[in-house]
Structures are given as C-alpha cells and as structure tokens.
Amino acid sequence: MTKEKVVLAYSGGLDTSIIIPWLKENYDLDVIAVCIDVGQDDDMEEVKKKAIKTGAVKVYVEDAKEEFVKDYVFKALKANALYEEKYMLGTSLARPLMAKKLVEIAHKEGAKYICHGCTGKGNDQVRFEVGIASFDPSIKIIAPWRIWDIKSREDAIDYAKEKGVEVPVTKKKIYSVDKNILHTSHEGGELEDPKNAHNKEMYSMVTPPEKAKDEPTYVDIYFNKGVPEKINGKEISPVELLNTLNKIGGENGVGVVDIVENRLVGMKSRGVYETPGGTILYEAHKDLESLTLDKLTLHCKQELAQKYGEIAYDGLWFTTLRESLDAFVDVTQENVTGTVKLKLYKGNIMNAGIDTKNALYDEGISSFGASELYSHKDAEGFIKLFSLPSKIKALKNK
C-alpha cells in the first residue's frame, strides 16, 4: 500500500533534520524534503545527501534567489519597508516565497500535508501557514514544535543523537541562525538576556566596524524607477548586485543592528541582524527619493512604509492590501531614477553625491539670491496665514 506524502520545508539544520525521523515514526508518511535556495550559502548537494541519509524518500532543491531579490526584496526596497524602524525583513520576505514553492511541490507530488520546523513561539509558523493557506487552504499542516515533547534546543540535540542525526550545533553555544542573500539573523543563547552585549564573533557577513578597512570605500548605485540596476556604472543581475553590495558593505562594517522586536505572537524577542547590502540600498534609495519626490508624496510614503513593513512581518504578503501598496509605490517611483554615490567607512554610510535629471531641488530657488518664482516678501503673507491658528488659540487663552 502506497504511503501518503508530506512535503517538509527542509534546511538541513537542527530542527528540520530531526523532523524527518519524527514524521516517519509518528505519522508513517513518505517525507519529501524541499530546500528553497534563497542564498543560504549551503552546499545543496550535501543538504540533499543529508536529507536522504536521514530518511527522506525524495529531495527538491529550488533555486529561488532571483525571484526572491526581484519580487520580494526589491519591492520592499522601493517601499523603504522596515519593521519597527530597524528590521529590514530578511526572514519575513523569504517565508511567503517558500510557502508558495512548498504548495507548488505538494501539488506536483500529490501530497496532502506540508510540515515546517518553526517553533510555537515564533513568527515563522504564522508566515508559512498563512502563505500556504493563501494558495491551498485544503493542505493540512504538521507543526512538530507545537506537538512533540521536545521543549528546547538541548532536547532537540539529544533527540538527534538518539536517532543518529548529525547537527551543526552544540549545547554550549546555541544560536538560532537564519541566512539568505539579504541577511543573517542570530537569536538565542546569551542574546536572550538583554543585559548582555552581543558577541561580534557571531558575525558571518560583516567585519566588526573597529576591524574594518582603514580607508573609505566609495560606491555608485544607479536606480531606474526605484530599482537598483548598476554598481559603479556596470549593469548586473539583481542577485549579483546584492551579493556585490553585501561584500562591499561587509568589508566596511556596515549593516548590523541589535534590536528587541515585538513578535506577531505577542512577546518580545531580541535578534542581531546582518544586512550589509540591504542597508546600503535602503540608504541610497532614500537619498534619491529626497531629491525626486515632492513633500506630500514623500511624507505619505514614509507613513505607508511602516504599514508595508508590518504586512510583510506578519506574513500577509499575499493580500490585496500589499498589492495595493505596491501599486501606489510604483507610481511614486516613476521619477526615482539616477545615481547615488555613497561613502562607506567603519560602519557608517554617508551621502557623497546624487546625480538625477528628475531632481525637484532647484539651486536658484533654494539659494538666498533673487528668483522670479519666489520673493522674500512672499513669506510675510504666508506666515500670517500659517500662524493664524496659533494666534487664535493665544487670543482665546488670554
């Protein structure tokens, strides 16, 4: 009799590695491991071998880097989306894409189940399951961390040893690490006590600023309607562009934040995020927008950037609201074209010049000299009208 199938979101890490024997033992399902490559820098052949060795009947490795950067990272970039003003959404943006790919493979394989290794306290369980439901609500979810008796990473390591599963962590130094082409996140371990400064030895993408290059690096980034297309005059693919900026930013100590964030599930958590290339792109994009967007549009867009960040963080990527915000953002980006030069030095990013034909800045108007469009005398009438509410309030308070 043919067994039913389960599609497992597989990384080769601790959680998903022990899930394979657990699924076979508790559900008697054929496990199809799926690794979505969004730039983790893992050896995918080794990941495949490990999945098979651990008990998977089949392994898919899907190269989704180009789609991830073009359709997720660059959309968030155009919106300047951040969560709680700091988090650049590295994990949040990857999960909807992974959910979409998992459903596609489940349909291809005729699998009724999808399994993920997200903990019952984290955001990713919501992101995966909302994403999956957006494409096929009939698929059944198996979430081991909400079911099994394993309560900690230490327990998980013990279970792995019991089942003969090799894992790349130890009980002495346990971090939860998520990596893709946009960022690397670090959680757990001593980070769980906010009194502790984080250990910079954990960095994998960024050189600590004090150890970074002693000479500044200059980089030119060309944007076409809000989308980065060239570095130092050379047009390159989105993946190559982000990889290049990751290297440049990392060498100059750029792009690390240590934050306490409000999780979707209601608790606070602390994370250290390395996002060198993304940090450079966001700074350059905002600099270009400061010249090319009018005040009303810029301020409205800044308000909506927070909402966009919340939508992405909460796993609501496949929603009408996100699509509607993208439509608004695309209109605002019509004139966001030009080259931004940045100076990078020991963790700092400084504007070193902007070249655009669409600048709304006019030196003749902004300077103290005479202008046909603006007379110094014009300010007097404007100030009288602008200050009228303040004058009325003062009179009423007498």
Curated annotation (Swiss-Prot):
Transmembrane portions of the chain: none
Residues bound to L-aspartate: 119, 123-124
Leading EC class: ligase
Cellular-component GO terms for this entry: cytoplasm
Chief location bin: cytoplasm
Top-level taxon of origin: Bacteria
The reaction(s) this protein catalyses: L-citrulline + L-aspartate + ATP = 2-(N(omega)-L-arginino)succinate + AMP + diphosphate + H(+)
Keywords recorded for this protein, A-Z: Amino-acid biosynthesis, Arginine biosynthesis, ATP-binding, Cytoplasm, Ligase, Nucleotide-binding
UniProt keyword annotation of Membrane present: no
GO biological process entries: argininosuccinate metabolic process; L-arginine biosynthetic process; urea cycle
A GO molecular-function descriptor: ATP binding
Compartments where found: Cytoplasm
InterPro entries: Arginosuc_syn_C, Arginosuc_syn_N, Arginosuc_synth, Arginosuc_synth_CS, Arginosuc_synth_type_1_subfam, AS_cat/multimer_dom_body, Rossmann-like_a/b/a_fold
List of residues binding L-citrulline: 87, 92, 123, 127, 176, 185, 261, 273
Pfam families with a match to the protein in the record: Arginosuc_syn_C, Arginosuc_synth
Gene3D superfamilies for the chain: Argininosuccinate synthetase, chain A, domain 2, HUPs, Single helix bin
Pathway: Amino-acid biosynthesis; L-arginine biosynthesis; L-arginine from L-ornithine and carbamoyl phosphate: step 2/3
Residues holding ATP: 9-17, 117
EC number: 6.3.4.5
PROSITE patterns, alphabetized: ARGININOSUCCIN_SYN_1 (PS00564), ARGININOSUCCIN_SYN_2 (PS00565)
Subunit structure: Homotetramer.
Classification via HAMAP family: Arg_succ_synth_type1
Protein name: Argininosuccinate synthase
Phylogenetic classification of the source organism: Bacteria, Bacillati, Bacillota, Clostridia, Eubacteriales
